[in-house]
């Protein structure tokens, strides 16, 4: 059964949310990978909004380490790694020192030629290595239109069934995704019974806070990450407008074509993906939910 209050597809009212909750944009990029802004600008914007921030650069941690030095901003150390299959995974750390060790021992030796390239580690191996540390592991944008989400053709149904229990949750709203993809991500998150997160996936500070994760907990890194694991978090946000999406995705697509054109070509054929699961019950739940959306299209599907 879907909880009608844990995911809201609407613009976050940040001034109200921060009164009684810890609010964090859990997916943001700096100029150290494919983002536009400096960490200083990111920290200033997060402070002005009154929210926490996770700088989750692609295969890179300098942004996460730098923002950890801003004592007036709640930051969640993290990295968005790219597996051998070209699929992304978000790894959040309770301690910045652990992120630095993980990066040195388990990322740098397996890097590709470019920072945005795939590493040489398969998804399962990345997760196993991340589990050596105190972490929260999340699948971002599972239904991303090209290939960077876990619901892509490189992962068979059987393989996904083995991988899903290995992680802590799913990113259910990503401001750079299409609405249909986010709806499917939300359904996947609920049906897996995992923790849920959301983030802007921002590459410019104007995107920060468009999607946030929040919890009624102490304003601390540990309390917030614990809330994700305990499935106490909620997510609110909307997709960015089409013009901004095209601009942002254009940069990403050029980078992706350069680094792994074979994956792009194969996965463009996979743009209309569906949730695959051995569980008949999960399949039926998803079908009913999606059919309900089509029947009620005259009413905006704002809350799941």
Where are these regions (language model features)?
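Ser/Thr-glycine-rich phosphate-binding loops at phosphate-binding pockets of nucleotides
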Residues: 30-31, 53-60
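Active-site neighborhood of divalent metal-dependent phosphoester bond hydrolases
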Residues: 97-115
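Divalent metal-binding pocket/active-site signature
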Residues: 109-155
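Charged catalytic cores and adjacent phosphate/nucleic-acid-binding surfaces used
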Residues: 1-32, 36-44, 49, 64-77, ...
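Short, ordered loop/turn segments at secondary-structure junctions
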Residues: 58-59, 80, 142, 202
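Residue-level preference for nonpolar/small residues embedded in alpha-helices
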Residues: 38, 59, 121-122, 181
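Hydrophobic anchor at the start of a short beta-strand
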Residues: 53, 137, 196
């Amino acid at each position: 059964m879907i909880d009608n209050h844990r995911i809201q597809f609407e613009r976050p009212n940040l001034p109200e949310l921060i009164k009684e909750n810890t609010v964090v944009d859990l997916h943001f990029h700096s100029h150290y990978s494919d983002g536009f802004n400096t960490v200083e600008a990111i920290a200033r914007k997060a402070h002005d909004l009154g929210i926490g921030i996770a700088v989750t650069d692609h295969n890179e941690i300098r942004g996460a380490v730098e923002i950890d030095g801003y004592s007036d901003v709640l930051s969640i150390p993290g990295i968005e790694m790219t597996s051998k299959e070209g699929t992304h995974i978000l790894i959040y750390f309770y301690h910045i020192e652990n992120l630095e060790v993980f990066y040195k021992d388990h990322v740098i030796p397996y890097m590709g030629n470019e920072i945005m390239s795939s590493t040489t580690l398969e998804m399962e191996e990345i997760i196993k290595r991340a589990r050596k540390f105190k972490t929260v592991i999340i699948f971002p944008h599972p239904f991303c239109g090209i290939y960077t989400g876990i619901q892509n053709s490189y992962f068979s149904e059987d393989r996904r069934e083995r991988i899903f229990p290995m992680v802590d949750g799913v990113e259910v709203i990503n401001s750079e995704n299409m609405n249909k993809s986010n709806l499917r991500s939300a359904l996947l998150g609920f049906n897996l019974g995992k923790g849920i997160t959301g983030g802007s996936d921002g590459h410019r500070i104007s995107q920060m806070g468009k999607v946030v994760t929040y919890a009624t907990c102490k304003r601390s890194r540990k309390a917030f990450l614990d809330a994700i694991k305990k499935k106490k978090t909620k997510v609110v946000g909307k997709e960015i407008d089409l013009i901004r999406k095209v601009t942002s995705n254009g940069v990403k697509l050029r980078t992706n074509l350069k680094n792994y054109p074979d994956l792009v070509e194969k996965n463009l054929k996979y743009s209309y993906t569906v949730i695959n699961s051995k569980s008949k019950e999960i399949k039926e739940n998803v079908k009913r939910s999606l059919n309900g959306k089509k029947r009620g299209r005259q009413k905006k599907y704002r809350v799941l």
